[in-house]
Structures are given as structure tokens and as C-alpha cells.
Amino acid sequence: MTHCCSPCCQPTCCRTTCCRTTCWKPTTVTTCSSTPCCQPSCCVSSCCQPCCRPACCQNTCCRTTCCQPTCLSSCCGQTSCGSSCGQSSSCAPVYCRRTCYYPTTVCLPGCLNQSCGSSCCQPCCRPACCETTCCRTTCFQPTCVSSCCQPSCC
């Protein structure tokens, strides 16, 4: 994992461009940068998703939108999936299925990390407030909205 390691749940020692951690049990690396790079959603610019558990990494991207990240065979964006999601590895914004500490949800086409349509729920790493039928959350700092969705979403 020379270009990309999982982001951090807790502060840990960092390389210049890469955090190395198993979130709940952070481990240090041999070389530390002078300015810590480990933040809840920080690493290299092309790999900035929070995680709750170790994330498998590709060349320049982590796919870590949930508590149990999935390895992908090719580089995908934050709202895309690849072969390990059971979809094309072309990184089109298609279905992602993730298992969280809370319910398993399915992100439908067109869903963004914090903005979804009426038929889309986002995975939750911690309890999150909901809007209509859409979970709106970031893993470590859930954003509460005025109304709550069905229990199956959050």
C-alpha cells in the first residue's frame, strides 16, 4: 500500500502521503511526516473517505464509505463502485451494498455521499438523523436533519 492506506478513526503516525491504521487499533509506521496527515477523512487527495475498519486500497483510491470497506480492482471515485460491489469495474455510479454496524443499505444510482433521492439510503457508521427516506451522515460526525426516515435507513 504505497499510495493509499485507510484513513483514521484515531490519530496515528503517518507517512507523508498515507495513513496506516486499523482504526480501532491504530498502528504506527516507520516513517512519520512532520505534519500529521491523519484526520477522520484525510490521506492523499484521491483517497479521502472515512473508515471504521481497515480498508483495502487500490493504486490511488480507497473505497471506504462504510464500516466494512470493500477492495476494488480498479480506481473508483467516492460515489462509485467496482467489481467487488458485484458491478462493473468501470467505476460507473452504480449499486453499492455495504454492511454497517447498523442496517445494510443499498445506494442506488445517482446517490451521493451526503445527498440522495427518495429511494436511496446511505450506509451509517453511527446512528444518524434522517431526511424523508434518506440517511444523511458522515461516519464520525452524523449530520442531523429535521425529520427522520424509516428505521431501515438508519
Curated annotation (Swiss-Prot):
<dbReference type="Pfam" id="PF13885">
    <property type="entry name" value="Keratin_B2_2"/>
</dbReference>
<feature type="repeat" description="3">
    <location>
        <begin position="18"/>
        <end position="22"/>
    </location>
</feature>
<comment type="similarity">
    <text>Belongs to the KRTAP type 9 family.</text>
</comment>
<keyword id="KW-0416">Keratin</keyword>
<feature type="repeat" description="9">
    <location>
        <begin position="66"/>
        <end position="70"/>
    </location>
</feature>
<feature type="repeat" description="12">
    <location>
        <begin position="129"/>
        <end position="133"/>
    </location>
</feature>
<feature type="repeat" description="8">
    <location>
        <begin position="61"/>
        <end position="65"/>
    </location>
</feature>
<feature type="repeat" description="11">
    <location>
        <begin position="124"/>
        <end position="128"/>
    </location>
</feature>
<protein>
    <recommendedName>
        <fullName>Keratin-associated protein 9-9</fullName>
    </recommendedName>
</protein>
<feature type="repeat" description="1">
    <location>
        <begin position="8"/>
        <end position="12"/>
    </location>
</feature>
<comment type="function">
    <text>In the hair cortex, hair keratin intermediate filaments are embedded in an interfilamentous matrix, consisting of hair keratin-associated proteins (KRTAP), which are essential for the formation of a rigid and resistant hair shaft through their extensive disulfide bond cross-linking with abundant cysteine residues of hair keratins. The matrix proteins include the high-sulfur and high-glycine-tyrosine keratins.</text>
</comment>
<dbReference type="GO" id="GO:0045095">
    <property type="term" value="C:keratin filament"/>
</dbReference>
<feature type="repeat" description="4">
    <location>
        <begin position="37"/>
        <end position="41"/>
    </location>
</feature>
<comment type="subunit">
    <text>Interacts with hair keratins.</text>
</comment>
<feature type="repeat" description="2">
    <location>
        <begin position="13"/>
        <end position="17"/>
    </location>
</feature>
<keyword id="KW-0677">Repeat</keyword>
<feature type="repeat" description="7">
    <location>
        <begin position="56"/>
        <end position="60"/>
    </location>
</feature>
<dbReference type="InterPro" id="IPR002494">
    <property type="entry name" value="KAP"/>
</dbReference>
<feature type="repeat" description="10">
    <location>
        <begin position="75"/>
        <end position="79"/>
    </location>
</feature>
<feature type="repeat" description="5">
    <location>
        <begin position="42"/>
        <end position="46"/>
    </location>
</feature>
<dbReference type="GO" id="GO:0005829">
    <property type="term" value="C:cytosol"/>
</dbReference>
<feature type="region of interest" description="14 X 5 AA repeats of C-C-[RQVGE]-[SPSTNQ]-[TASL]">
    <location>
        <begin position="8"/>
        <end position="152"/>
    </location>
</feature>
<feature type="repeat" description="13">
    <location>
        <begin position="134"/>
        <end position="137"/>
    </location>
</feature>
<feature type="repeat" description="6">
    <location>
        <begin position="51"/>
        <end position="55"/>
    </location>
</feature>
<feature type="repeat" description="14">
    <location>
        <begin position="148"/>
        <end position="152"/>
    </location>
</feature>
